[in-house]
Amino acid sequence: MPEVDVEILHETQSLCPVCLRRLDARYVRRGQSILLERTCPEHGTFAVDIWHERTEEDVTPPRFDGWSRPKTPSYPREPRTAVRHGCPYDCGLCPAHAQHTCTGLVEVTLRCNMACPICYAAAGGAVPDDPSPETVAFQLDSLRRASPGCNVQLSGGEPTVRDDLPAIIRMARERGFGLLQVNSNGLRLGLEAGYARKLREAGLDSVYLQWDSPDLEGCLPLRGTVALPDGLDLLAVKRRAVEQCTAAGLGVVLVATVARGVNDDRLGALLRLALKLGPGVRGLHIQPVARFGRYPGRLEDGLRFTLSDVMAALCRQVPQWLRMEHFHPPGCEHSLCSFSSL
């Protein structure tokens, strides 16, 4: 095989994925791929693709070293931890944290009514008891002191398995937060008539609805099989959930977990579906599969899909709507965490 040119772009710090030791690391360009490389004295060297600059079908993703957006640090108003051991061990948030909270994620349960093969929260199975209403109130009060008026996403697990979810939503609304959103797989929203309206009346604004593909073939490898009543399939229930939310006045954002070779060829079709389901559906959020929570052991070898891959796939699949210049680094989080578009 021909040798691949190697270029060290810059140095940074990272963690050993096994023991979480802080390590010196470097971003390296190898051919058309950008890798984050680090070596743990105990567990060896790790290298992971984080960006692809390849040209394919006249679609060229942005160069890695040009993908940045300078930001002025915005520190938390009330840090929760002191600086003792350095990043990330003091995080909680500490006084050195250079970004205030834009959206606070509050986990209200680790229970779930699905058992997805890929789950960022590793939810379901043997899980601890739900946090009490008093604990949730304490978390919301802490979040309000650190970043008053920020948006809040109630997450899990599956938040709708809690029968007191409307009370939790009211609790958050009473504390003056901005947008209130629930992260959901949509089962209860689609199957229980009137449930979406209950959440709306409690003060909910939006539902962050899991939806990986416009067809079952692209969903089942990520979600597994689900026992549903009346001969319904998973996508039929999700469509009902969108209808119920729209009728109740709740906005919906479709959220897709994308894995290479599973549903990466369906992103354009998913965008077309999101537009078709508007104005109830107001956005599409695409999350590349990640190596945390619950994931298959072969993830490193084949399923990884980078941000640049997402941008390139969208431009190839819906060229009439999207071009590479439509994508920009985010305004809140680190440039390598996400992108935004029109």
Where are these predicted regions, by residue range?
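Conserved alpha-helical substructure of the radical SAM core
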Residues: 32-47, 51-53, 61-63, 68-184, ...
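Radical SAM/AdoMet-radical enzyme domain recognition
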Residues: 137-153, 162-288
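Short recognition patches in nucleic-acid-associated and regulatory proteins
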Residues: 15, 20-31
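Short glycine-enriched, charge-decorated loop/helix-capping segments at active-site entrances
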Residues: 122-130, 221-232, 300
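Flexible glycine/acidic-rich beta-alpha junction loops that bind and position SAM and/or redox cofactors
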Residues: 217-223, 261, 281-309, 322-342
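Short, flexible, mixed-charge glycine/proline-rich loop motifs
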Residues: 3-11, 29-33, 109
